[in-house]
Amino acid sequence: VGGLNYLVLGFVNGIACGFSIPISWTFGAKDYKEMRRYTANTVWLSIFFAVVLTIVTVALTRSVLVWTNTPENIIDLADIYIRTIFAGIPFTLLYNVTSALMRALGDSKRPLYFLLVASFLNIGLDLVCIIMFHMGAFGAAFATVVSQAVAGLGSLLYILRHYPELRWSREEGCFSLTHCAKLCSMGIPMGLQCSITAIGSVVLQGAVNGLGSDIVAAQTAGGKAAQFLCVPLESIGTAMTTYASQNMGAKDLDRVDRGVYTALGIGCVYSIASFLILRVTDKLLIGLFLDASETAIMANAQSFIFWNLSLIHISEPTRPISIS
């Protein structure tokens, strides 16, 4: 379910990041009235996308799992897990939008703090739900959704208390087709960019699922390890979204150029370093997701992560340029 999960949640993360671009732009230009209008319309669009995505994904999950040849011995567990995750899309979008708003105004620390709290809470709830209450796949998904809800609601309360400049008047809070069109022109392409590769992963999953549950387990573990190593590169791109938007709004194009080249350099250095480290520690990294005694699955996971990251680390350093 990794590809399907990333397809939807990657889109959610992307649209939230895209919605923040006009807000960053107007903040950099010190046009606070327009910034509040974009913020208000971001809220209306987020509610719309949360409702539509939740209904569509929950309704279609089982059909997609069948279409991708999910093995019969795990399809029910996969269905329960992914449906529960998708039922929590409103909370996922809430955290992504509120954290994007804080980053748009130059605060990248608080989103991290709320995410750390959610991560530790998720670990604790996993132990409680799976080990103590034996809730299985549903328990793991439920723990994730609750953690996202805590992070999202915490971020929202923080914004309401500490960012009075985002509080819009009745006039500024009215739905505006012009502002929504601008937000969608940024958010939807960003959402597709963050999820488009997952479409290929979903199609590939259909072929992988036909090879049996051992190969599925290997591909899932390898995919988690690969995603773990790619997160810093994606974060550089997300940071460049805010950085470039604020400086474009302030009309400081030289600073944008310097930021892009700096981000590209950081991405290249990280890609080379992480790939070299991976060659030494791949078994240890995959061991975080697999039992070391499952040698056949471990070998297949090592093969997957090697070829996966060999290709990704060639293209991924250019992500900051394409996003910014």
Which residue ranges define each predicted feature?
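Alpha-helical transmembrane segments of multi-pass membrane proteins
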Residues: 72-95, 227, 233, 295-315
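Short membrane-interface helical motifs at transmembrane helix boundaries
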Residues: 52-83, 273-295, 302
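Small-residue-rich hydrophobic transmembrane alpha-helices
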Residues: 1-55, 92-111, 218-282, 315, ...
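Transmembrane alpha-helical core residues of multi-pass small-molecule transporters
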Residues: 2, 49, 117-121, 143-151, ...
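Membrane-interface helix-loop junctions in multi-pass transport and translocation proteins
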Residues: 119-153, 283-287, 296
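Interhelical loop/hinge segments that connect adjacent transmembrane helices in multipass membrane
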Residues: 144, 155-197
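Helix-terminus/linker motif at the lipid-water interface of multi-pass membrane proteins
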Residues: 1, 65-72, 128-135, 195-224, ...
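Residue-level signature of transmembrane alpha-helical cores of multipass secondary-active transporters
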Residues: 46, 85, 111, 115, ...
